[in-house]
Amino acid sequence: MDGMENLMPREKMLQYGIETLTDVELLALFLRVGTRRQDVLSYAQALLQRFGSLYALLSADKAQLIAVDGLGLAKYAQLKGIAELARRYFSSQLVEEAALVTPSMTREFLQSQLTEEEREIFMVIFLDNQNRVLKHSRLFSGTLSHVEVHPREIVREAIKVNAAAVILAHNHPSGSPEPSQADRLITERVIKCCRFMEIRVLDHLVIGRGAYVSFAERGWI
């Protein structure tokens, strides 16, 4: 692979495969052009150095992004488009492939869905008896700091798709994923409701900014 380092991202991808691109090169591939002062590779590197990672860059809000020199509305739209495309890819992959859910897959999917939400959203993943995904739904939407959850509605949706188990999740827009006492109480209520219909609650994940808490990992479920 001599000379690979001299290739532009598109040529490198076409010759050696997309997996050979660094984060900087992959970002440059999407941005396509740099600024008057920097070529696209230098600009992509500067962006990643400023934000620290692809995740932090794509999770940044509009004010944070357009404050960067050379990053106008066009590049802001490109970056948000990349993030949304990734979110929708995760969403469709989980259902279309009827994926067997693993803890890491669950976490990555839920983070892609909930991290950037500005209100609390309560999601449920419905699974069959082999832990394959039947569907996932955003069942409840709330405010910046609260979402009202109705356990019977969760059970009703589970029965509709003949689910044997569910995974619960909601986000904390404040950034901290630490569960509140109210979070623990509603989880207990959902577990009791589901148990009555012989539906297992496998986990409840609280998603924050770049962090999460799993009730199962803490031994609360």
UniProtKB/Swiss-Prot annotation:
Give the binding site residues for Zn(2+): H170, H172, D183
**Domain MPN: where?**
99-221
Question: Which domain of life does this protein belong to?
Answer: Bacteria
Provide this UniProt record's keywords sorted from A to Z: Hydrolase, Metal-binding, Metalloprotease, Protease, Zinc
Q: Name one GO molecular function term.
A: metal ion binding
GO biological-process terms attached to the record = proteolysis
Q: Where is this motif: JAMM motif?
A: 170-183
Q: Which InterPro entries match?
A: MPN (IPR037518), RadC_JAB (IPR025657), RuvA_2-like (IPR010994), UPF0758 (IPR001405), UPF0758_CS (IPR020891), UPF0758_N (IPR046778), UPF0758_YicR (IPR022820)
Give the similarity note: Belongs to the UPF0758 family. YicR subfamily.
Q: What is this protein called?
A: UPF0758 protein KPN78578_39390
